[in-house]
Amino acid sequence: MAGAMVSIVGRPNVGKSTLFNKIMGKRISIVEDKPGVTRDRIYGNAEWLDKKFILVDTGGLDPNAEDILFSKVRLQVEAAIDTSDVILFLVDAKEGLMPEDEEIANILRRAKKEVILVCNKVDSFKEMPPTYYDFFSLGLGNPIPISASNGLGIGELLDEVVKRLPQEELEYTEETIKIAVIGKPNVGKSSLVNKILGEERVIVSNIPGTTRDAIDTPFSKDGKNYVLIDTAGIRRKSRISESIERYSVLRALAAIERSDICLLMIDATEGPTEQDTKIAGYAFENGKGIIIVVNKWDAIKKDNNTVNEYTKMVREKLSFISFAPILFISAKTGQRVHRVLETVDKVWEEYNKRITTGLLNNVLNEAILMFPPPADKGKPLKVYYTSQVGIKPPSFVVFVNEPELMHFSYLRFIENTLRQNFGFEGVPIVISTKKRGEN
């Protein structure tokens, strides 16, 4: 299950980031050529024994993680409890058991979550350091010894992780549209969810939510089935202060992973923030449909040009999701909320759209004739043909003579051509290149 989350927690300097990087290897995709996607390395998609999960380094949640006060370590632990299925509690065999370790253990014991105690900086398994045995007193089971820096014991640790991952969640049918409501705290996510569920002809299912914390609300309207994944609705009163925005990214991430379409909610009185950019970047990189929902529009003083000016500002700040439609609503008054599901339906169609190979190549060949690819170091790029290889999101492979000759700016030209001719509003398009004749 791709949506299972595994968080690494522990006091500063126990090796959280080292363990994170060792497990992830080089598989973290940092996309350089997509401006506007700000990425900090706090999470990555991991896989072990055919089981997929998201690995989160809570230390990376705070830029000053090396010298943070314990109150912030506590916040990281609370964030992990709030959003994770399995928690790796990392301790340091070199320093031994510290009071902060006992504090963290106390919090984790109260949480009804799978916790794996991991003892780092054990350089040899032949003879355990005496400090190793002190950690048994934490009451969290036998510590798994590892050395994150040289990889010792990592395989055994991952074996244990996949054993503890939750069973598959409630499966929805392929036709069910999974909608994540994402955005920073206090932007009106719950208000929007409640307004949508209160609309005419909306029938809310009484199927209970899934095993994880985000509340799933299945419902139907006009014969179509939907599920709202409400990140604001991690209903247990979180002890995380809502003002600490960076921790809310974890909630958004859990919902984004499980969704088809994301409603990115922005506070009209603030405009898009760095936090919004980060959350939008996660949705974009995960290939989700995106609708920008500007809430609290009733609080804005308007003239004839307000919508145009605001749209321009949003487009500039979120330029990497320029394909996303923008809705101006008030969840409080209900203004234009009816357009949310209408737009979801349209984006869902685009998300599932297939273009026949013949039509696709007719359009692209004509565009390539008019604007041939530039030669790189004197060697011309030859584009032979293009195939659509997937949906959700629409994915294409361009077959060429030498893939390394394809410049990202020409890929962008191909993407723009696809959008101008076939729409794809609200969805990212994935384009890769292959040498002709390769499988």
Curated annotation (Swiss-Prot):
GTP 2 binds at residues 183-190, 230-234, 295-298. Gene3D superfamilies: 3.30.300.20, P-loop containing nucleotide triphosphate hydrolases. GTP 1 binds at residues 10-17, 57-61, 120-123. GO terms for molecular function: GTP binding; ribosome binding. Transmembrane segments: none annotated. Residues 353-437 form the KH-like domain. GTPase that plays an essential role in the late steps of ribosome biogenesis. Associates with the 50S ribosomal subunit. This is GTPase Der. It comes from Thermoanaerobacter sp. (strain X514).
